[in-house]
């Protein structure tokens, strides 16, 4: 029977008055205890995971331990952890949403043996707060009382260890109840986990950091920063329009002086604001860190500043270069932080000389984050000299107003600076990507497909699904080396003469049940992470590379969408959605499909499915396949033309392939060439995504997952318009239709690079496409600007995107006859779906950043050991696409590289090009105009660089110890580069990234075998992309310095 209590809350209003609120609080005789020792499992009604039965004790951390040591409690070795509701609420109220979400995710994670016990709703555990009792004492008393109840509830069969930092609680409760022990967290680790070295090191680091914070708070220091305003003042200011709320974005090229606050989160009533708000200098930033949700006060207009437009290297001192900034823009200062965005940071210790300069016995060390946007962090350690050659992870603990730098603590070592695995681990940590293997519980949910026990289509599914194995020619077209084939196509002529177009997608949701362990894991990962040399799958390989991969010649479950098209106009007559069984006839690569489309039938010898056929069968099947590819392409052209008529954009992106020579060395970087068959497949997928979006929105208008692409801000197109104007083109950006038409017309017949650069600028001006719940915004906001579609979603890649799994479940619920049953297990509420969309958007952004950074690793690897003074491949043609006050921005078409080239060096000398067009540095000055920049020396020589000029560029590497190495560009001639005979571009097809990794690893293995080093054999499924469970063969690359990879990022103020 429920018992009713009253909880009294005292809140302070904006006017400073105290408001007394009384709320009803109901207590239950039974709440889920999640213990396998529960004597009344039916009454406790356990939902979700249970604590492991293979433990010697349960551990219950009090509120302070949860707040300070959560990162240790995350260790998978620590098992049997019971988080009390009281402790969780304390984290939520005192540490903010980020820490609370971290705790929630830990509780949801099936790989961690921990549960939540709702002690404040259990009749015997709930304790009212006594008069005069502090909140901290009440929380500790409540947790201890719940621990005692839990021990007796399990019939005294499992000892309970309560860990606390409250010495009074240890003395009071330590020997009060037999079987319930109360000790400090440090003693707990010493006694129960003496061999868990990483936990002990982290605990010592946290303790030392905490002691120093306490000591600093007792000392008297001058204020380095103003105090943040109280929360109630900030909220009142936002509501009244005096303050503006937004996310702080630090300019990584001028991290000490420039940051910006985006306006979309603002509530300001100031209608004059049409741009971001500039936060100039560290004082105005007031201890906020990149990504924090901040509250900003605008400065008077006479104090507004402009952003700097000069190029600037990241490792410069951020001092003003003397160049005039842009026009003044809204400028403000941070007055408070609503939500901190602190995360794990990869840092580098100072060099030996720098450490010695701080004093021989110095324990407080300033470490430099790998991310330029993060300030130096002060940590306490006696290992500074030991760790100075390593990349390490630290976490920020606090940033007091009396300290110039934030305080943090050491977490763990990643690897040596410059080593491949250390650099890859850096990219993963910086993007908050976790790559731990799938757990045993998750793998137990997976189907079995082995030679001894092969997977087969079940008779039940055969009855429920439409069988397309004999009636349809189904085939896939994918990149070389692709193993996770999640989409196939079909096209055929119907009896009435019309055509039937089919898109068939792997039925992942058949194998991944809602809220199962593997579903929760896939939701957490949200996407498959593709790096240049490896991938980290969202789903186990038994699904992603086998049973959910629509490989040729095997039966597979699919979710299909099939349209009946008019035979002449290709207009859609009807559409069918449903679950099917398919058997793909061909697994084609893009290149082979394009050759067949172009009529080059000799490529048939490279298609495995044709090898064992007799000539007659071979000819018949070839004609059938060629007709299907041709018809698909014709349909795709029609579909694309319709979208083009509505304003669909064709934008520019550069993807680079890596070529190897005969000796397995990286020989060349070649931008991939687009093929028409790429567009054919893409149009079919876009069509399927569009129709599924319409279907799920019609059925679930308030809780469907769609993808929106908002129109870009017009001011973002200013550079595009000015550059086009320099070539005599006019770019109309009023709508996607006018923009698309303008870009199509902006073609220079003498230089096709111009149109590519203009499209690239248009891409940079675009907003990001985002997932959203249809219940969270108005229908007119559903539009996808880039694709020119009113509704769009992602349905076609459920192997590698969790959003597609959600959409598959929505579609199945929409077409299900028994909707009530489907809806119950498959659909999120609008609120939960919107939260999930935010998470997926965040993970997608992390995936994009990590892929870009790892690709830049290979670009840097290519140039790392080449002598730029003598190596012809370090010389290339470059095209100027932007003018700055002290240099230009260049695009290198051959390698797909963008970067900056200075026209004035650090010594104040300017570039000069003599009669032979070769450059040298001389005293002089620069004069910047709208579309050109002129360098004039003191002896009267001058050279002018215009937008879209072709120049000769030298490419080299700029090394950095604390950050990633970067590519550096230098103009050596104001004339285009003429490729010599010895430098002709090879005509052979570029190798894919996966093939590159195989070749590089092979050469490493051979070198190691020559040294008689034993190498453990890695399972075949991990060879493709080097996704390994333990130590990888990549650790062996340390022995071959010429293959060491270093991250490349654009290191200039662009």
From Swiss-Prot:
One of the GO BP terms on file: RNA processing
UniProt keyword annotation of Hydrolase present: yes
Cofactor(s) this protein requires: Mg(2+)
Protein name (record):
DIS3-like exonuclease 1
One Pfam match: RNB
- Which InterPro entries does the entry link to? Dis3_CSD2, NA-bd_OB-fold, RNase_II/R, RNase_II/R_CS, RNR_Ribonuclease, Rrp44_CSD1, RRP44_S1
Organism the protein comes from: Homo sapiens (Human)
UniProt GO cellular component terms:
centrosome; ciliary basal body; cytoplasmic exosome (RNase complex); cytosol; plasma membrane
What taxonomic lineage is listed for the species of origin? Eukaryota, Metazoa, Chordata, Craniata, Vertebrata
